[in-house]
Amino acid sequence: MKVVIEADGGSRGNPGPAGYGAVVWTADHSTVLAESKQAIGRATNNVAEYRGLIAGLDDAVKLGATEAAVLMDSKLVVEQMSGRWKVKHPDLLKLYVQAQALASQFRRINYEWVPRARNTYADRLANDAMDAAAQSAAADADPAKIVATESPTSPGWTGARGTPTRLLLLRHGQTELSEQRRYSGRGNPGLNEVGWRQVGAAAGYLARRGGIAAVVSSPLQRAYDTAVTAARALALDVVVDDDLVETDFGAWEGLTFAEAAERDPELHRRWLQDTSITPPGGESFDDVLRRVRRGRDRIIVGYEGATVLVVSHVTPIKMLLRLALDAGSGVLYRLHLDLASLSIAEFYADGASSVRLVNQTGYL
């Protein structure tokens, strides 16, 4: 479905009492599908303009739109979202990342500057919101929705509020150890020929998908090489997080399942049933969960509301999915994640979370 989005925002004083408005039309511009307005307290014109864009994009996504034409009278927002101008102000950068994350969900989207005379509907909504902001000392007035669709901060059927931090969870490509189905934890094998082909295909898919604000990776070579390949396709740098490393399998490193079971039959059996059990000289799955949660929390704080590519290993990715599902340890033994597969988990500032995708491999 194709839609037209009109958005506007402003402040009285710049900065001053601010608000935004957004409206989503059918492609022929004949019918209003959704509209939003909100007073946002004291802010600048540019912040309010971005907030209006985010509201319009969010409404369009929730309507199921796949294509969008965005019309705004803010030259700055149009040029920045089109990639022709750089975003330098830190307050705008955060909003830009949120807007790009929403825009990435459309198959096709374009931005057009229009004079204010062609943006009167959204301008009226924004002025209504600014009136409300001027009448209230509250910095965050409640959003006023006019039709039965949701604003960016209204609760959906999950009860979550706001824009989530979306984690695209990419498992590294194949290595010689993974090809032989051997335990591969803190050992540092590189990608093999198949692995390099896999990560190239994944990187191409992610570049076409777009909307990714950052790449965070395990420091182990197989994951880091996967991350660098994707980051180059996305024109981004790689940030390394040690808490994303694979489980330390200790003495079982490099062994097959059968070899580890033969070496320590009773311990191996218990390890498969109890996440507190530690392999000889290694770490338990409970230990992995604790550090992965710590790493996840850093990502959420550092990239709040953005889409982040997280490149890691099978166990840390399972742990992130477990956290998003708020599930028990049993889910670890029931999830299958292929090499170079993609999963998606979302985490909201209010503590809500969801899993959007598990083990996508169609691009390979």
Swiss-Prot record:
Reactions listed under catalytic activity: Endonucleolytic cleavage to 5'-phosphomonoester; adenosylcob(III)alamin 5'-phosphate + H2O = adenosylcob(III)alamin + phosphate; alpha-ribazole 5'-phosphate + H2O = alpha-ribazole + phosphate
pH dependency: Optimum pH is 4 for phosphatase activity using p-nitrophenol phosphate as a substrate.
Entry's EC annotation: 3.1.26.4, 3.1.3.73
Active site, UniProt feature: H172, E246
Chain positions recorded as Mg(2+) 1 binding sites: D8, E49, D73
InterPro entries the UniProt entry points to: His_Pase_superF_clade-1, His_PPase_superfam, PGM_Phosphatase, RNaseH-like_sf, RNaseH/PGlycerate_mutase, RNaseH_domain, RNaseH_sf
Pathway(s) served: Nucleoside biosynthesis; alpha-ribazole biosynthesis; alpha-ribazole from 5,6-dimethylbenzimidazole: step 2/2
GO MF term list: alpha-ribazole phosphatase activity; DNA/RNA hybrid binding; double-stranded RNA-specific ribonuclease activity; metal ion binding; RNA-DNA hybrid ribonuclease activity
Assigned keywords, A-Z: Endonuclease, Hydrolase, Magnesium, Metal-binding, Multifunctional enzyme, Nuclease
Disulfide bond residue pairs: none
GO terms classed as biological process: cobalamin biosynthetic process; RNA catabolic process
Cofactor note: Binds 2 divalent metal cations per subunit, which may be Mg(2+) or Mn(2+), and which are essential for catalysis.
Pfam families (alphabetical): His_Phos_1 (PF00300), RVT_3 (PF13456)
Domain notes: Is composed of two domains, the N-terminal domain displays RNase activity and the C-terminal domain has both acid phosphatase and CobC activity, together with a role in enhancing the RNase H and dsRNase activities of the N-terminal domain.
Function: Endonuclease that displays both RNase H activity with a hybrid RNA/DNA substrate as well as double-stranded RNase activity. As the only authenticated RNase HI in M.tuberculosis, probably plays an important role in the physiology of this organism, being likely involved in bacterial replication.
Family stated for the protein in its record: In the N-terminal section; belongs to the RNase H family. In the C-terminal section; belongs to the histidine phosphatase superfamily.
Protein name: Bifunctional protein Rv2228c
Source species: Mycobacterium tuberculosis (strain ATCC 25618 / H37Rv)
